[in-house]
A protein has these predicted regions:
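Short beta-strand element of the alpha/beta-hydrolase
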Residues: 9-21
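Short beta-strand segments enriched for Tyr within beta-sheet-rich domains
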Residues: 12, 42, 116-117
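Short beta-strand-to-loop junctions in surface cap/lid or active-site-entrance loops
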Residues: 1-10, 165-170
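Structural cue for short, hydrophobic secondary-structure segments
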Residues: 17-20, 36, 46, 179
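Short amphipathic alpha-helix adjacent to the substrate-entry channel of hydrolases
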Residues: 28-48
């Protein structure tokens, strides 16, 4: 979504939204809240990445369990395409996601920090490995269907460890990050984004 007459010269800022989990589709739809951004020259885009079901059930299965890395590389590819097509440029993209989409934000921050100017991570599920290993948490066992059971499956453990945002923070330059935590959120405990941001403050250069 962008204003008529947009010059595709890479100068426009972009807000790129993504989710990519649980087979949830994010259809293109009208929202008056986006018009304020578009009126100020933004390009607004939604990335239909694997893990969602925008292109059928197989699209979902290719973005869960041992295929989860596809979710993150798809989102990065969407951002790179927008830049290559001139809608925006590298370093002018702000990414937005919440809950499992917040995990997406944390993962792409580690994998491709220079692509993004900023990230908006709402109630972000970023301490994935620690949470999925704790079977005493009431919501953990049902989540094994989506992420795998790292307690019993070595491959699932290694896959989750490879992308869990908190565990993969390293010393590098990160984009600006706005993180929101929900004090009473029943799914994502508030300390996950809190400890993630604390670690980012320590390691970001």
């Amino acid at each position: 979504l962008y204003r008529k007459g947009l010059q595709k010269d890479g100068t426009a800022p972009c807000l790129l939204y993504g989710y990519g989990s649980y087979g949830i589709s994010i259809p293109a739809s009208f929202s008056v809240s986006r018009l304020s951004l578009v009126d100020r020259g933004f390009v607004y885009a939604i990335a239909h990445i694997r893990g969602g079901q925008e292109r059928g059930y197989r699209w979902y299965t290719q973005g869960r369990l041992l295929n989860k890395m596809n979710t993150f590389t798809d989102f990065i590819a969407a951002g790179e395409h927008l830049a290559e097509a001139g809608y925006t440029s590298r370093g002018e993209i702000t990414a937005h996601g919440g809950s499992a989409g917040g995990m997406l934000m944390g993962a792409v921050a580690n994998l491709a920090p220079s692509l993004f100017k900023g990230l908006i991570a709402e109630v972000a599920f970023v301490d994935v490995l620690n949470t999925i290993l704790d079977e005493t948490l009431p919501l953990t066992p049902p989540e094994w269907l989506e992420w795998g059971n790292p307690i019993e499956d070595k491959d699932a453990y290694e896959m989750i460890a490879s992308y869990s945002p908190y565990d993969n923070v390293r010393r590098q330059a990160y984009p600006h990050i706005f993180a929101l935590a929900g004090l009473t959120d029943p799914r994502v405990t508030y300390w996950e984004p809190a400890k993630w941001i604390a670690k980012l403050r320590e390691f970001s250069t």
